[in-house]
Curated annotation (Swiss-Prot):
Protein name as catalogued: tRNA(Ile)-lysidine synthase
NCBIfam families named in the record: lysidine_TilS_C, lysidine_TilS_N
Domains as described in the record: The N-terminal region contains the highly conserved SGGXDS motif, predicted to be a P-loop motif involved in ATP binding.
Protein's organism: Staphylococcus epidermidis (strain ATCC 35984 / DSM 28319 / BCRC 17069 / CCUG 31568 / BM 3577 / RP62A)
EC number assigned by the record: 6.3.4.19
Keyword tRNA processing: yes
Family of the protein in this entry: Belongs to the tRNA(Ile)-lysidine synthase family.
Catalyses which reaction(s): cytidine(34) in tRNA(Ile2) + L-lysine + ATP = lysidine(34) in tRNA(Ile2) + AMP + diphosphate + H(+)
Any one annotated GO CC term: cytoplasm
Listed InterPro entries: Lysidine-tRNA-synth_C (IPR012796), Rossmann-like_a/b/a_fold (IPR014729), TilS/TtcA_N (IPR011063), tRNA_Ile_lys_synt (IPR012094), tRNA_Ile_lys_synt_N (IPR012795)
A Gene Ontology BP annotation from the UniProt entry: tRNA modification
Length: 432
């Protein structure tokens, strides 16, 4: 049985995930008997999901097998009772917990790589599953020989082998294994693909399952191109604030095609460590809203995150992000430098003493300011509209008020005549 060994070196400590099924037992046997010269140390890991009575028999069998062959083994018993009780599917959660534990063991042992027994038939199954469940649009269509999970390396040395080759190898060497009868239950989608769809393809002389591999290769190349275009957009158009919000031009975003838009959003949520896996139909709804003519609105993402649309600006932000930093009011009694909601306020020493104390506060209904160089006053709210200030930013901008309740300055948008030499306000909110 010819497995690929270029995923590790002769000095490597390899960790092999073994379920006691025919695939993983054949891989373990092959590493012990045919490829023992390709690594320095081999350790076995096994997860007992505790969902079948036979699972404890399998655990005992593998423990004894490793003892006889002088292999270190680590076993994890998962408690999935909470998921089963809720009636939820356990497959994805069990996989997540398995691989997290594998990572813990690899870190503990300072091992180099985790080996799994995925093979070519598993690859066909994965491609079909992702295609027909809509999981292929923004993800790789299949598995790769090498990947990473939480910073540790996973390698699949049997990904080139057909199931029939593994069966022949097991039979020739009389390798002991256990059959998980749940693998025969066609209520699970992957089992149905494995037992019904793939055999039907193989039986039809006009069909060739290997064409799926060509599709995977083409798809992965195109996906990489999309990611590169999305990264270019992010590098050129997206600004990041020190509070981990991302903002960019609504117009520039609307000029992208839907595929690049989707990948841009994926990458930004990944950078925010949101752990979101948004379905394409949700993205399509968002993109339709972003294309409309409404000047300001919010798009609900999760209970913690929103997308704020403000004129030509699109902002991804935490819902609580603005409120938790907002100051409402401060009092200035002497010259100096002051901070107010990410704005820096510099009061010059030559500001007439009789003007103190100054009040710095956010806007209030009815606030007006005197127009420079002309008669009359203008509402602060109208200034914000004219300058296309976002709703959130309007709650942060400092107004400097004197004892007579006259507005001397409004953020970096306005300073009253005769005070420009004494009051300087700058917006530091976008500094990192």
């Amino acid at each position: 049985m010819n497995i690929k060994t270029d995923g590790w070196s002769k000095k490597a400590h390899i960790v092999v995930a073994v379920s006691t099924g025919i695939d993983s037992m054949s891989l373990l046997y092959s590493l012990l008997n045919d490829y023992q010269h390709t690594y320095r140390k081999l350790t076995c890991v096994h997860v007992n999901h505790g969902l079948r009575e036979q699972s404890y028999e399998e655990e005992a069998f593998l423990r004894e097998y490793c003892h006889q062959h002088h292999i270190d083994i680590y076993i994890k018993r998962l408690d999935l009772s909470d998921i089963v009780a809720d009636g939820n599917s356990i497959q994805q959660e069990a996989r997540q917990r398995r691989y997290e534990w594998f990572g813990d063991i690899i870190a503990q042992l300072r091992a180099d790589v985790l080996l799994t027994a995925h093979h070519l038939d598993d690859q066909f199954e994965t491609i079909i599953y992702r295609l027909f469940t809509g999981r292929s649009t923004r993800n790789s269509l299949g598995m790769t020989y090498e990947s990473y999970f939480n910073q540790y390396k996973v390698y699949r040395p049997m990904l080139n082998l057909k199931k029939t080759e593994i069966l022949a190898y097991q039979y020739a060497n009389q390798i002991p294994y256990y059959e998980d009868m749940s693998n025969q239950d066609r209520k699970y989608v992957r089992n149905d693909i494995r037992q019904r769809i793939i055999p039907a393809i193989n039986e039809n002389p006009h069909l060739n399952a290997h064409q799926l591999l060509k599709l995977k290769d083409w798809h992965d190349i195109e996906l990489q191109s999309l990611k590169e275009q999305a990264e270019t957009f992010i590098n050129n158009e997206v600004s990041k604030s020190k509070y981990l919000t991302y903002s960019f031009s609504r117009t520039a975003f609307n000029e992208l095609n839907v595929n690049i838009k989707s990948v841009v959003m994926d990458l930004l949520f990944e950078k925010l460590d949101c752990h979101l896996a948004m379905p394409q139909h949700a993205y399509d709804e968002w993109f339709e809203q972003i294309r409309n003519d409404k000047s300001q609105f919010n798009i609900h993402v999760t209970d913690e995150w929103i997308i704020q649309i403000a004129y030509d600006k699109l902002i991804i932000m935490a819902k609580s992000e603005m409120d938790q930093y907002i100051l409402d009011r401060i009092c200035i009694r002497k010259p100096g430098t002051y901070e107010f909601n990410d704005y820096q306020i510099d009061i010059h020493p030559d500001l007439p003493q009789q003007l103190y104390p100054l009040t710095v506060r956010v806007r209030q209904n009815g606030d007006v300011y005197k127009l420079n160089g002309q008669k009359g006053h203008k509402k602060v709210s109208r200034l914000f509209i004219d300058k296309k200030v976002t709703l959130a930013e309007r709650q942060r901008i400092p107004l400097i008020i004197n004892q007579e309740n006259a507005v001397l300055a409004i953020g970096d948008l306005y300073v009253k005549e005769n005070f420009k030499e004494f009051i300087l306000i700058s917006n530091n909110g976008d500094e990192l």
